[in-house]
Amino acid sequence: MQGNPSLLAVHRTVYRARVHRHDRRLPTRIAPWLTLALIAGCGDDGAQPTGPATSDTLTTVPGTMSGPQPSSSTGATGDDPHVTTGANTTNPDGPKFDVGKMDLGSSDTEDCGGPVSPDATLTGTVYAPNLYLPISGALVYVTTGPVEPPPDAVYCAECVELDCSTPSTFTRPDGSFSLPAVSGPNQKLVIQKGQFLRVVDLAIPAGDTALPATTTTLPGRWDPPAGMWIPRIAVYNTSPDKVKNVLAKFGMGAINDNGALIEGTENFTLIPDLSGSFLENLAEMNKYHIIFVPCAATKYWPEAPDVPPARLANVQAYVAAGGKWYATDHSNEYIEQPFPDYQEFHSPFMPDIQPAYDSNGTVVDPDLLAWLQALPPNLKDIGGGYPNLNALPGITTRLNYSGIDTISPIIVQDMEGKDVDVGHHPWVEGPCGSCSDPQMIRPMAVTGQYGCGRMMYSTFENSSDNHPGLSPQELVLLYMILEIGVCFDEKPPPPPG
């Protein structure tokens, strides 16, 4: 199939590929250099869903739902018991998921095997599993073929093409979408963001259909028989940076009235923070798509602030194989020592800053900014004396315990021998009031690429205490989690060095 050269951009890296304007790119393959790595193997605010009204013309394919059923004890997971779900996952040649960032073009089907005239339009809003937080940049498409799920372990998420005749679109910053489609039975609605994937069997009537939020919501649990997949996540069960609460408020667990995770309901793995022994078993690490090492998790480990050589090598191998690695403030050694060339911390021999400082920063990533601006008022300001988002791009981050002096370009060669910068991308910047130059604007939340994986770091804690609703820095964390899960538009280059 012929097409015009298109530019595909992922953060600061721009790739060139020949892509017809109706091709869609979704992940599948594993880079050859990954083989050895794989073998070695720190609430809900009461808002109600604001999704579109349900059309009474939508029909579902007769069938039954199998697998675990929704339960009020595990929190809202966006599950609709009236919609039958499921995906044929046995055919590796069917449309795959996920796309990077690219322009999907118009509904023209030139060079696509003949004209297809849409006679139906599906509209709706994609929400987080909590049914109220909109999801920006989610892929929505309709297919009659099988859908390949994400592997149940770490993998290299390289994009592949989705057939140009497949109706597809991305959600807007407010999570909404409008998808022209062809009416008929036995179709699948696919909604995907990173490793969050939902497949819903439905019959599409002619005309306009507003899909209910319970149909268009990302799943909150791993339940393949019900057409639901989520990233496998491991998070250290520590305090005060309670990332577990943020994940629960996203919809991956039940929360109490104070916005705290009700332990036992989580759809992720809690790792005891008594030691770093989990990081000494690469095979165990490779079971997870994302690993969180929050602030206080490492602070009292016997070897702190050093990272033992075997543990350091495991972190590098895990990320190179496609893992997503996240650390915050006091756990900075788990970014600095495995990836020393990517950033320079303030006072590098003692990067843990006291006293902690608040920072009046700025959101510098345009897509993150657009999403925050599109949030409804009750999500921009949760009250209780917490910072709000009413002065964007300004954002106040609380309890920063480190400072980054610089982030550096990291130049590697792609598969064509061309230079590619895989260094950190800044999302939020601001001054460090406890640093020697308190007026200097510094990166405060960053993500970088290392082989097939990505690492992210923030100088601030994300969830220091139990509280209802999602604070600005918790929202930034969730957006970054979703964005680092998307696939690579080109085969990722090997790690630097």
Please give the residue ranges for each predicted region.
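A glycine-rich, often tryptophan-bearing local segment used as a flexible ligand/cofactor-contacting loop or short
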Residues: 298-405
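Helical hinge/lid and interdomain linker segments adjacent to catalytic or ligand-binding clefts
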Residues: 234-344
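A short, solvent-exposed beta-strand micro-motif common in secreted/extracellular proteins
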Residues: 140-142, 173-178, 184-199
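Extracellular ligand-binding/catalytic regions of CAZymes and related secreted enzymes
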Residues: 335-364, 433-497
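Ser/Thr-rich, Pro/Gly/Ala-heavy low-complexity intrinsically disordered linkers and tails
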Residues: 41-119
